Amino acid sequence: MSHFSSMRRNVALVLAASALTLGVARAADTLAVGVLLPGSRSDKGWMESGYDGLTAVQKSLGDKIKVQMIENISNADMEQALTTLAQKNQLVIGIGGQTQAALTKVAKKFPKIKFAVIGGNRDETVPNMSGYDVKQAQLAYVVGAAAAMVSKTGVISYVGGLEIPPIVNTGTEYGNGAKSVNPKIKVIVNYTGDFDDVAKSKEATLAAIAQGADIHYHILNLGLRGMEQAAKEKGTHIIGSYTDRCGTDPLYIGYSITGVGYLTEYAIEQAVAGTWKPGYKPFGLAMGPKASGIAMCGASADMKKKLDGISKDILDGKIKVLEG
């Protein structure tokens, strides 16, 4: 039966805990899968979505896979954690574009092991590595349009973690989508420098609220909790990323379907089936609602029609968006 080996930030503990899995027998037809979840599995965001996909594929594939997972790892410790996984698994997956640089380095050292990055881009890849692009910027354009449709103040905000091209491009397209609906809308964009910093995310959201923002979007992991705290205190609302909060949390008026879990399942299923291929693979809106889309809680038929039309225009090339 598949099982998780979850390890924390201390690299010594990571290595020690990993060693506990070494004696577990693995059937010849069982795929050993190592997964690096740099954040928390319960962040209500990217990491949780990836974890949900991992648990789903465990249920569907059963004894065909054995999973070893490392979570809550800092950037400085990422390469060593991935090396630990590569030493004992046939497929190693990094959840999040922040794992791509370290994953590339480790993949070069283990040419017989398959590697996949969920949220990868067109950066350097190696012959034994695949990069699955969720196309966040593409989806953010649609989310921005939705935010503009529901904003009562004409001011919306976006908070990103690391100020890197995919996250910056996502913020840019969020603003472009909003302005396609309301050219006069004000879009406030901030980067905290850390996907998991709750205090900085709260501070950035409160600053946006002080300028009139009533709808917030994000690319955050645990940092989302800070945005939630600010929105709850000030009575504003969030369009979430990755996980469905409609009907369970009044702060949320919608969520974007970024498909992190779907891509995690895809990587493992392809490897088990023997159809896994290296290289860059874009997903996004073209791959359907499991991979990318938007769900607005209680949206009217008219709003759904407008958002579907915007998505179609992106797919048809009538609306050009940035990479990311």
Predicted features and spans:
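Bacterial N-terminal signal peptides that target proteins for export
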Residues: 2-14
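Intrinsically disordered, low-complexity sequence elements enriched in Ser/Thr/Gly/Pro
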Residues: 6-7, 24, 92
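C-terminal segment of classical bacterial N-terminal signal peptides
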Residues: 19-26
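Low-complexity, intrinsically disordered short peptide segments enriched in small/polar/basic residues
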Residues: 8-11, 21, 62
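Sequence-pattern detector for short linear motifs
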Residues: 11-12, 18, 44
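Initiator methionine at the very start of the polypeptide chain
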Residues: 1-2, 27
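A residue-level marker of the well-folded mature domains of exported/periplasmic proteins
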Residues: 27-324
